[in-house]
């Protein structure tokens, strides 16, 4: 990919019911999710998410019995671009992170699942350019478009260490912040590649579990909330306005994966 090193280049839902996930996210975000596995996925139940504009919104992986027994649970997970997965693994583990899954070489590139020093999981990936597209760029993230991931948020028990870790390995810059009160401290904005791509905050019991949460662009946050509740999801934080004027609702899907929707309040 021609994205800057450290970019968010893919998002994946691990779920116990891919068909139910397709119905839910179709209603809430408007995505189309394939009704059968990708035949090139090597026997795994892996399905692609398609946006209304024909672009890709990420993927859906059905959790198998073996994966569940090894600790997999419904969750969204991000892929960060690195130029060399082996080198990234060495650097991350030397800096207190962990390798959760060894490097795998797939038709789309090299991947490995890792965790930061506080335990938040994510993938590192060195992608293979699509045939005939040497300058292809991943556009699953956008700061303002519906049906893209618009915000990447990390809750961490050690905010200072997380800030330094992601700066060293992925070039995240957290130079601006806003106060969140005495219990949560500052909310640190993440800038990368000239864009404001997300934020970091202190993990606290009242703020829910730690790790990464991803916020999908919606055309109406109010409509997204209604769709979440009507389709078996659970709203974990009600509609609220955020800096810049957009509105956000946080939720879990029917299988328990955490996510949010951000956009105009709408009707």
Q: Could you describe each region identified by the protein language model?
A:
Residues 1-22, 75-78, 125-163, 175, ...:
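N-terminal beta-strand motif that seeds the catalytic metal site of vicinal oxygen chelate
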Residues 2-4, 7-16, 47-50, 66-91, 93-146, 175-195, ...:
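Vicinal oxygen chelate
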Residues 35-37, 52, 59-69:
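Conserved donor-binding loop and adjoining core beta-sheet/short helix segment
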